[in-house]
């Protein structure tokens, strides 16, 4: 005897036709997405000197590039939305938020889908991060590579976004309502790129009255307060342990260099050149110095009064768009603590550039480190600043309207990938590119990791933003 289940629909002709229509709707949506992805056409100026064949290859490069990240999704819809969002970041749209991208590339019905991509769909974050670093290392790795750490702020008007609070905002130069994140950049003679980030949560976000806001912003329950310096060390550790990137140097500004605990926990087998404030106290090792300064210490700014102590020399830092960039440098061995032990001995590097504002930096590099090496590393601070400037102005780094913890980090990752694609594109064609001819990059450009790539979705050329048109986002001038 067959028992009917009232919860199951009867297999009537009307029901079967409805199911068929539903399947046809799914197929229609997939075909429409395929057409949208295929309609993306590049618009490159003559400055890039790309032939018609090269222009067609741009689409192939994007299709191949995005294919390496398909494994992070597991479903067709989020994979296609990932490609759509990446195209939007690379488009000519003035705003790069989800609504603007959807309206430009597909229409208002796609806005909700992109929102789900950033906040609801499952991503294998670890897999995407691993592949991101793998492709970046293939493009940038060099023994002269330098890591840079820095914070960047994003002004906000409301109070609902994750991590927003009154705090110092570098973008405005004052305390303001904003979010702040810690970022890691890797630079080499081949170019530079942002590789990871972490949103900073001010202490107030861990107070009881913020419990509901933490829940609404989907902050992981086990998240605890950490300083920006602690976040930077957490971000650096897996990158260094991956052994994919050459170079032992790490640079940071005063917000990191002035924190002794941060420098004391520095990763082994690496050197830092960290900027410090002019009021930072040191103990001089050299002779001919006031006995009081040797015992009680002095500020680094006070050392300027001892003329025989500093041997100023002019050095070329890099080649700029308007000619060589030069500055005067001096250095002296100091102790960074009153203990004055060999373990606390450091290089103090002084730099006087065109602004005539002297900058100071400490380094744990060995005593026999050449001056030209310190000069080279001191010039490696600008790549991360340029990344911020160009990613915000061209790739929508600060155009997001997400409020959750997950969406903030996903947005940053997608912007990093868009930036990396532009770098790969420029190295690939080597037209109007500033690539070190002595590098190990093959003559035919970037070679993706030697693993089997997943089958690409239909994703052909499209309109690039002004930065993409220049095809020079990630390379020095």
Predicted regions and their residues:
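A short, flexible helix-boundary coil/loop motif
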Residues: 11, 15-77, 201, 208, ...
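Conserved, well-structured functional cores that handle cations and Mg-NTP chemistry
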Residues: 34-251, 255-299, 329-334, 345, ...
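Short runs of predominantly hydrophobic/aromatic residues within well-ordered alpha helices
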Residues: 62, 79-86, 98, 358, ...
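Short acidic (Asp/Glu) and glycine-rich catalytic loops that position anionic groups and cofactors
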Residues: 94, 110, 353-358, 365-370, ...
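Short amphipathic alpha-helical "interface-anchor" segments enriched in bulky aromatics
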Residues: 149-153, 256, 369-402
